[in-house]
Amino acid sequence: MKVKAVFINKPGEVETRWVDYPHKKENEVLIKVDAAGICGSDIGAFRGTNPLVTYPRIIGHEVTGIVLQEGTGMPDNIKKGDRVIVDPYIYCGHCYPCSVGRTNCCENLNVIGVHIDGAMQEVVTHPAHLIHKIPDNVPSEMAPLAEPLTIALHALHRANVKAGEYVAIIGAGAIGLMAALSARHYKATPILIDIVEERLRYAQKLGVPYVLNAAD
């Protein structure tokens, strides 16, 4: 049996190809993909500007789907048939960064769609402990945004943002917008900086109080 997958063969060359149906290991789950986001790093892979990507590569790390087969180590609140989002950062759990909770800095980190094949294919396997259940009130097509949201929240947490503070955020792309809107939930005041006026106007429509065009 075969499934379709999105490959970047080399910079500037993308195609849909048939690949073998994945067979999971005991500690993996099998997931039927139903939505995937296109990240800036995917665009970088296509353009050849992402130095971490090797080719050919199945892209995709902002991915949601339905659990087809369960695996050992799966969170207790998840079962076959549930909608899940994957954590694309596969860490070893044994190195020093992992031992202090900085799994994103794992010395042996593998990011799906970057270092190893990703999830822009009809059916994928993924480590069973690295999936999260999607709340019933979140549409599948919106759920992939949870991954870039975690990037924005991580930045706010690392900066130790507190209520009443002003927060300068450089870049009004998806993650910058999420950081600005999240800062408001922390009762902080975001100042969003970009050189694309259209992005800044859109940010204002979303409720970002202060924007600055750095090209002015």
For every predicted segment, state its role.
Residues K2-K4:
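Extreme N-terminal starter segment of soluble prokaryotic enzymes
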Residues K10-G12, K25:
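Residue-level recognition of beta-strand termini and adjacent short loop/turns
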Residues E13-D20:
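Short glycine/threonine/proline-enriched tight-turn/helix- or strand-capping micro-motif at secondary-structure
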Residues D20-A36, T49-Y96, P135-N137:
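Glycine-rich beta-strand-centered segment in the early N-terminal region that forms part
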Residues S41-F46:
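Cytochrome P450 core scaffold surrounding the K-helix E-X-X-R motif
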Residues C92-I170:
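NAD(P)H dinucleotide-binding glycine-rich loop of Rossmann-like/cofactor-binding domains
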Residues V138-D216:
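Mid-domain Rossmann-like dinucleotide-binding core that forms the NAD(H)/NADP(H) cofactor-binding site
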